[in-house]
Amino acid sequence: HWFGTDQLGRDIWARAWYGTRNSFLLGFCIALSDVGIGMVAGALWGYNRKLDPFMIELYNVMTNIPSTVYLVLLAYIMNTSYLTLFISMASRGWIVEARFFRNRILSIRDSEYNIASKCLGSSTWRIVTKNIIPQIISLIIMEAALCIPYSIGNEVFLGFVGVGMPVDAITLGNIVNLGRESFTQHPYQMLLP
């Protein structure tokens, strides 16, 4: 038992690996949804000027609420499950990604090849999918890679506070939360995972 055992005699090393797998799976799903929805919304937002006032106000409203308060409130109101965590994190993250992609698309929207495509009669959807999204594919990969640890951190925070996953689910947040209860006698149970 490299990390020792908890109060019930369960191996913390094995639970940490299993919890890491569950947390990575949740983080990967959230990253896919955030970047996927944010990319499409940001592409349309950056290319279509009519959406700009509405999306700016939506962005301002959603980002003025601190993310930790938002996540704790949603997790507290809804039942604790993977779906609840996924919905609460994904409903907040896509707008930040959309703003990021919008800013990049604004810089390449008025390029000569986009103007030429528009003059030749290409639809907005075709210009966005054929000309703009291939230009930002490296940013899509980078944002997805950065979104995974952020989502894992949020899951650990919610589990530590006690509003994350159910107690019987093995996640990093629940392992740290269980280690917090015996921190004074066995600090390694909280610090090692």
Please state what every model-predicted region is.
Residues 12, 16, 20, 24, ...:
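Hydrophobic alpha-helical elements at and bordering transmembrane segments
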Residues 12-44:
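Transmembrane alpha-helix signature in integral membrane proteins
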Residues 2, 6, 33-38, 43-47, ...:
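Generic hydrophobic transmembrane alpha-helix motif, especially the helices
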